[in-house]
């Protein structure tokens, strides 16, 4: 991604925040064959609480891995296939995340939650203002690993500790707004 796009998105055009939210093991495992390698009810509930009544962006494979379309959320599904369509009132297919970010740029009331998968996280975590990261305890098998450079982020509140995972909250270091 070019620095010009980042400057454009973070400068003149401004939406409230880009928030990336995901669960991973301490090794960075996030998926196995387009599914989550774990089924932790409390972690799913945490995701639901964080994203309810919000706008989400995710990749096509992530969308198809969902048990159903999430209720009470606007969902944008990123696809490189120009003829790909989804017929649902709360779901819109987009072909370039930059267009979506430009559309939301002047909206200072809406956050955009990045909800996976690997490619979408790799593109949008560097643009994110907030990271909400669940670290899942235990060992799991999988084939999708996310490597995140946390050097531009700082933990801004105490982790939430659960039996099977812990949630960490980070904000971008140069963020001027208090959280």
Curated annotation (Swiss-Prot):
Molecular-function annotations in GO: dihydrofolate reductase activity; NADP binding
CDD domains from the UniProt entry: DHFR
Domain of life: Bacteria
Top-rank EC class of the record's enzyme: oxidoreductase
Cellular component, GO, one term: cytosol
Binding, NADP(+): 22-23, 30-35, 59-62, 78-81, 115-120
This protein's record includes keyword NADP: yes
Residue numbers binding substrate: 21-23, 43, 48, 73, 134
Gene3D superfamilies on file: Dihydrofolate Reductase, subunit A
Pathway the protein contributes to: Cofactor biosynthesis; tetrahydrofolate biosynthesis; 5,6,7,8-tetrahydrofolate from 7,8-dihydrofolate: step 1/1
Name the record gives this protein: Dihydrofolate reductase
Lineage of the organism: Bacteria, Bacillati, Mycoplasmatota, Mycoplasmoidales, Metamycoplasmataceae
Name of encoding gene: folA
């Amino acid at each position: 991604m070019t620095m010009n796009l980042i400057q454009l998105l973070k400068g003149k055009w401004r939406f409230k925040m880009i928030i990336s939210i995901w669960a991973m093991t301490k090794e960075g495992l996030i998926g196995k064959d387009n599914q989550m390698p774990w089924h932790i009810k409390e972690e799913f509930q945490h995701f639901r609480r964080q994203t309810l009544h919000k706008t989400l962006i995710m990749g096509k494979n992530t969308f198809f891995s969902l048990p159903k379309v999430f209720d009470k959320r606007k969902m944008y599904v990123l696809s490189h296939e120009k003829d790909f369509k989804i017929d649902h009132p709360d779901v819109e297919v987009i072909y370039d995340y930059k267009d979506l970010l430009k559309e939301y740029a002047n909206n200072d009331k809406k956050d955009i939650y990045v909800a996976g998968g690997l490619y979408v996280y790799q593109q949008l975590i560097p643009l994110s203002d907030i990271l909400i990261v669940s670290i899942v305890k235990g060992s799991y098998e999988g084939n999708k690993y996310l490597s995140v450079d946390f050097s531009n982020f700082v933990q801004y509140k105490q982790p939430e500790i659960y039996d099977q995972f812990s949630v960490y909250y980070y904000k971008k270091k140069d963020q001027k707004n208090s959280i």
